[in-house]
Amino acid sequence: MSTWANLGLQDSASPLMEQLIFFHDHALLILVMITVLVGYLMFMLFFNSYVNRFLLHGQLIEMIWTILPAIILLFIAMPSLRLLYLLDEINEPSITLKSIGHQWYWSYEYSDFNNVEFDSYMIPTNELSNDGFRLLDVDNRIVLPMNSQIRILVTAADVIHSWTVPALGVKVDGTPGRLNQTNFFINRPGLFYGQCSEICGANHSFMPIVIESVPVNYFIKWISNSVNS
């Protein structure tokens, strides 16, 4: 989900997303180098009038084009495996948020507090304010503290959904009868937008997600008002 005139990924708002962007750039660099090398070899092959009689059957060249791709794959696989383990690791979360996907809205529960739960619907275009984002703004945002480890539990009430926020590097499938979890750490304040990323019916495109990241003291005030109300 890119923003206006943006050809790359969104600006990261979590350490894990920063690592994902680094891995993307790392893999892209390797792919560009391979493309340039293969393009150069093909160019030289087409425009070269000489023939190498050992090219089609030579042990040295066969060893090179067998071992070299294996080494290149290792350079891609090792950072990828490291990232996979980092994404699955849960580091003593400060807050647990439960997200339940419905057709076609999200329900949220703050599991550490009593009676803090709400539904989050997309604001229709005809009710949107001038500074709102079409198909992205919701009536009830998720409010979370910055610089805190957050655990999110994701499930669904009807069909398979997917809770996704690109700026945080988070994508968790919500499956009926099953509870999936992941964690993230928001390192700056702001509004972060996401959408359901699993086709879930006619109004799949109208299930946005909005996270409002605030300092811890503001979050405490917000949660106190929510509990008292």
UniProtKB/Swiss-Prot annotation:
Q: Where are the transmembrane segments?
A: 27-48, 63-82
Q: Could you give the cofactor binding note from the entry?
A: Binds a dinuclear copper A center per subunit.
According to the UniProt topology, which residue ranges lie Mitochondrial matrix? Answer: 49-62
Q: Which GO terms describe its biological process?
A: ATP synthesis coupled electron transport
Q: What class of enzyme is it?
A: translocase
Q: Keywords in UniProt for this one?
A: Copper, Electron transport, Magnesium, Membrane, Metal-binding, Mitochondrion, Mitochondrion inner membrane, Respiratory chain, Translocase, Transmembrane, Transmembrane helix, Transport
Q: What is its EC number?
A: 7.1.1.9
Q: How does this chain sit within the bilayer?
A: Multi-pass membrane protein
Q: Which residues lie on this side of the membrane: Mitochondrial intermembrane?
A: 1-26, 83-229
Q: Name one Pfam family in it.
A: COX2_TM
- Compartments, as annotated in UniProt: Mitochondrion inner membrane
Which GO cellular component terms, listed alphabetically, does the Swiss-Prot or TrEMBL entry include? Answer: mitochondrial inner membrane
Listed binding positions for Cu cation A2 are 196, 198, 200, 204
Major localization listed first in the record, in broad terms: mitochondrion
Q: Please tell me where Cu cation A1 binds in this chain.
A: 161, 196, 200, 207
Q: Which GO terms label this protein's molecular function in UniProt?
A: copper ion binding; cytochrome-c oxidase activity
Quote the InterPro entries the UniProt record gives: CcO_II (IPR045187), CcO_II-like_C (IPR002429), CcO_II_C (IPR034210), Copper_CuA (IPR001505), Cupredoxin (IPR008972), Cyt_c_oxidase_su2 (IPR014222), Cyt_c_oxidase_su2_TM_dom (IPR011759), Cyt_c_oxidase_su2_TM_sf (IPR036257)
Q: Which family does it belong to?
A: Belongs to the cytochrome c oxidase subunit 2 family.
Q: Which NCBIfam families match?
A: CoxB
Please give the function described in this protein's UniProt entry: Component of the cytochrome c oxidase, the last enzyme in the mitochondrial electron transport chain which drives oxidative phosphorylation. The respiratory chain contains 3 multisubunit complexes succinate dehydrogenase (complex II, CII), ubiquinol-cytochrome c oxidoreductase (cytochrome b-c1 complex, complex III, CIII) and cytochrome c oxidase (complex IV, CIV), that cooperate to transfer electrons derived from NADH and succinate to molecular oxygen, creating an electrochemical gradient over the inner membrane that drives transmembrane transport and the ATP synthase.
> What is annotated about its quaternary structure and interactions?
Component of the cytochrome c oxidase (complex IV, CIV), a multisubunit enzyme composed of a catalytic core of 3 subunits and several supernumerary subunits. The complex exists as a monomer or a dimer and forms supercomplexes (SCs) in the inner mitochondrial membrane with ubiquinol-cytochrome c oxidoreductase (cytochrome b-c1 complex, complex III, CIII).
Protein name according to UniProt: Cytochrome c oxidase subunit 2
Gene name tied to this protein? mt:CoII
